[in-house]
């Protein structure tokens, strides 16, 4: 891991490596930040800590963006009854996210001798707080305390780290307890269906659902968490945290990451470099019921605990039969290279399928699912240990790892993507004896925002 994820630079070292994004974000006014966030193409730096991703655009970032090394995903429940409060929150979130992705603070920093002294180590320029900024701080940036800091300050000097922030809307934004909510029930996309209960699900309410979704991805764990932390604070009084989860990648950058089971995860993804595939499988079109979703996507998040203790005591040959791939190369069984095509018709000398009938690769393959594909952008998680009773032999009852996969999948329609694919996996996949789905959510992720507008404007204003 040390070679895969370079150590973060010191605050002074970051300045030498290129602190322009942070300095610009802190010293420019709102217009300057918006212009920086509008970058036509990602400004990938040689150092992952200085990489900058644009915020504004046709699509939201964090979907087809090259995967960063860390994530923090969260869902919030709306507590307000007023439609205008939701719009106000989305405006504030959009402005803050545009700043954060450029390496700036969530709100304009205060000025004065004390502030300058505190920032001396980071060499971040302070923005001159105008009357308009002060009013914004009093209303938007400090919803519960007008004197609260506009930013927690825990990532000052760390750089943008390729941060992307993605927002989504859960079914609860449209209806609650069967009743219209905020006048949006008629605008709920047909594709935003409630996920069915799948075989083997052991969902925990506190890790399931949510009205609003935030996904922050960055090349630094603290930067990803910091982004969600600021946005959650800005939501005080309008929305409350329902669940949150951090995650990480394993593997060299630019290569398919490995999950905690030691296998490469995402090899058969549709290529994000091919627009025709993204338009077919990932980006939503302008349907009659939800024209505002054109250019957006539908995101499924599943928290999947893996019984690592059980898995670690199985033979590699068996593990490869479970996956349908060779563990170390990532190649399909019987092949040599990771990206060799999967041949589901190939048989051994005895007439048995080379790739087992109930292997993960066969059951999830496009050829086994009427041509359906989803874009997986998953992360591993490790939350320490807990006491568990295993649901498969040997049915151990002991303290085990609370670790596994934050499964994240984007698609143009869950009804033809995740739902039928996972229904088959939940019934027949050999991997089920090592995994348990304990969290689940689905969100409509609207298209990107334009400068001066906000995420989801098409839903509320057209």
Predicted regions span which residues?
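Long, histidine/aromatic-enriched segments associated with O2/redox biology
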Residues: 13-33, 38-462
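N-terminal secretory signal peptides
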Residues: 1-9
